Amino acid sequence: MSDPHSFLGCVRRGLRFDMFKDVARQYPVIFCIFTVMISSTIILNQYLHILMVFWSFLAGVITFYCSLSPEYLLPNILISIKTKRKPQEQHELFPLGHSCAVCGKNQCKRHRPTLLLENYQPWLNLKVPSKVDASISEVLELVLENFVYPWYRDITDDEACVDELRQTIRFFAAVLAHRAQRVDVPSVVMDKMMKAAMKHIEIIAKAQQKVRNTDGLEQAALAEYGADLHVALRSRKDELLYLRKLTELLFPYVMPPKATDCRSLALLIREVMTGSVFLPIMDFVADPDTVNHMVLIFIDDSPPEPVTDPPSTLVPFLERFADPRTKKSSVLKLDLKEIREQQDLLFRFMSFLKEEGAVHVLQFCLTVEEFNDRILCPDLSDDEKQRLHEEVKKIYETYCLEESIDKISFDPFIIEEIHSIAEGPYTGVVKLQTMRCLFEAYEHVLCLLEKVFTPMFCHSDEYFRHLLCGAESPARNSKLNRNTSKRGESFGISRIGSKIKGVFKSSTMEGAMLPQYAMIEGEDDTVEEAVMVFEDDSPGPMDAVGTPGTLRNLSAWTISIPYVDFYDDEVKKERIPVFCIDVERNDRKNVGHETESWSVYRKYVEFYVLESKLTEFHGPFQDAQLPSKRIIGPKNYEFLSSKRGEFEEYLQKLLHHPELSNSQLLADFLSPFSMESQFRDKMLPDVNLGKIFKSVPGKLIKEKGQNLEPFIQSFFSSCESPKPKPSRPELTILSPTAENNKKLFNELYRNNANLPEGLEKKHNQNYFMELMEVDGAYDYMMYIGRVVFRMPDWLHHLLSGVRILLKRTLEAYVGHYFQYKLEQIMEEHRLVSLVTLLRDAVFCESTEERSPEDKQRRAKQTFEEMMNYLPDIVGKCIGEEAKYDGVKMLFNTIQQPLLNKQMTYVLLDIAIQELFPELSKNQKQGLSVSTRWM
């Protein structure tokens, strides 16, 4: 016998109780009145003649209300068609709509977004039919074969770089597929895209009134657009620049985390995708012959061809395409076993996990390994069982509880079984010897470490710092002594040359090697030996900043610059304003030390010396930068006071930067016992005009006119500001093929609108949109009938009256019909056909193009099908001549290539904003100029 709950569920679905619930929630008063009336009619059916009076009164009230309230619309009367609700907006931190890979929470604030498995591997749980996957793979293979391999094979036969490019392309395609699944396509098309189409039709209608034939329609419409013309239509060069800019804006969302840090890879992908893929696709889509073909497909009412082949099996998205072709393993690749076997690598791996907020993932793995070693002992005493039971409780509370900050996402059955052991008697802990829960939890975490964090570590700065600095452990370096360092001592790849010997000895850890910056004039070519800097080499008061053997954590320090004070400079014999820095150290409480505090006085220039040294060691910090240094002008008390807040914020950001958490250089800057000469401004001298004017006459007297000309030239050169460094090389080609000019300039589009640069146009008025808001398929139908087909006034008034009764019903039907058509297009054999057409359009350039006669034949067929698509009753209502003129106008509209391209880019902007709503919140200037009237 079936379950009564399932039977009631079937009855509920059959009677559509959910629909009645929605109606009751939306119209509570009307629903209550109708419920009372229907109940009274059923119960008191012998008094039906009396109840008819109330039914008539109710019908009259509703009719009178609807007549006096044109804004009121009757709900959809097609019960079988239910409007699809838009998906709720996903949390910005997790754009793919999945929970955190570590703790499982959907709004995790602890872990970084890169920890999201679907963000790092978006093809997870994404499967497509094998035929569709093969078609897409074929197109992507042609992209590589035509635009990458021709020049790459001249450099090397190694496929490693192309394999990385394959992974990046797979990532890009998977992100688009995931985001497309979240978009309510019928709603977007019927709302935003149809509004854009109505605007386009309005422009065409106004332009047609100004020309006598279709030859000048395109130019008149472009002029009518005015400033609303899409920026990509100004010229072919602007079109290419727009696609480049759009591609760069999408890089952070469609490429793997930190992939854009590699500028060369980003430029390569941008140029290949922009010039060789996106531009030909836009040309293909806007081609009138292509538009005619799409119109024929859409209005074709013939039944679809029966599918002869059975559905193909589902396969992981682009898995075969992304399979590495090279058989050689990278020498830089690591696995988790190698990391754990080397103490220094393990230390750096833990530092990396700390930056990612995932140290507890590795800690869980180590804890379970130790726990398994103990619980698998055959003879366990009661004391050992109690201790193991306490450990199980701790594991559950730390890694399984929802409110725990170290929660790891496990399957529910794992959490339930661990919970049952933790809450049960301690003797039940031996069940874990045979239960699957702990073993599967361990396998899950181990897979997380091996498949996600280990590859991320191999691409991290921490790992490459290990490769550069060798295998010396920072903890072991801190035990060395300055006197034991010998000239010429180096490690790792720092043996390459003596000129860079001191650079690779630097590190941010305690006991790092810092190069000597005090350079003697005239010895620019010499390379000084690096000096070991230790806090414990200083006298007793140095203990306030560091303790031998204790790892420093600058992120636990707090600083402030409360005021600006004066300092007596014994050399210059004057009082100099300095910043007073109050420092509080709180990172040694776990070893028994109380909070320590002191004050440090630093000059204005010393901050810039610190920034220069940190930049040389670690590169620039984009989130922590000093304001521009004042070179000429007084640096008095008032000036320093105005900069106090900015300098304080700069130091606070440095302290919280993970890479500087144990920086010796930053600790010395905040220490009152650092070397006096360490932050002198010899590397950043101020421009002293007085010294220049005093020194030049002396040099001229000393030279006595000898070699005066080269001296004056060198003097002028020294007074000029340094020339700016050349910017990053910018690729300006489409692709390394001979077809560049053909793709950028062709006979169909020529130079697009061919507008001169800097031309400003005023916005044209929109007479229709200012009078009435057009919303929904019913309003679009009325607008097209009024503007395109010039329907008579009586029909317009009739449709306006019927609008109250049928607007929502018609729009529900149109949405349902569009969804049905979309599902037909998304069928396997049709998707394969569409991808094949795209492949032929982009890559089959050597084959014969369609002849003008073929295009003319298709255009004629399109016009005839458009005429036949409208029912005969339309011609009877508006007249056959008006019907012919309206269809002719719509047909002429899609025969203009530049107008098609304008519409294509407008629709592209809408699609991009729907796929990537983050761009709408942080919309950059120039992304879209066509959304003003949407």
From Swiss-Prot:
Domain PX: 557-677
GO molecular function: phosphatidylinositol binding; phosphatidylinositol-3,5-bisphosphate binding
GO biological processes: autophagosome maturation; autophagy; cerebellar Purkinje cell layer development; hindbrain development
Gene3D superfamilies, sorted: Phox-like domain, Regulator of G-protein Signalling 4, domain 2
Keyword field contains Ribosomal protein: no
Residues covered by the PXA domain: 129-303
GO cellular component, one term: lysosomal membrane
Keyword list, A-Z: Cell projection, Endosome, Lysosome, Membrane, Transmembrane, Transmembrane helix
Disruption outcome: Loss of neural tissue volume: neuronal cell death is associated with impaired autophagic degradation.
UniProt superkingdom: Eukaryota
Subcellular localization, as worded in the UniProt entry: Lysosome membrane; Late endosome membrane; Cell projection, Dendrite
Primary localisation category: membrane
Residue ranges of domain RGS in the record: 335-467
Similarity field: Belongs to the sorting nexin family.
PANTHER family recorded: SORTING NEXIN, SORTING NEXIN-14
Function of the protein: Plays a role in maintaining normal neuronal excitability and synaptic transmission. May be involved in several stages of intracellular trafficking. Required for autophagosome clearance, possibly by mediating the fusion of lysosomes with autophagosomes. Binds phosphatidylinositol 3,5-bisphosphate (PtdIns(3,5)P2), a key component of late endosomes/lysosomes. Does not bind phosphatidylinositol 3-phosphate (PtdIns(3P)).
Designated name of the protein: Sorting nexin-14
Higher taxonomy: Eukaryota, Metazoa, Chordata, Craniata, Vertebrata
Gene that specifies this protein: snx14
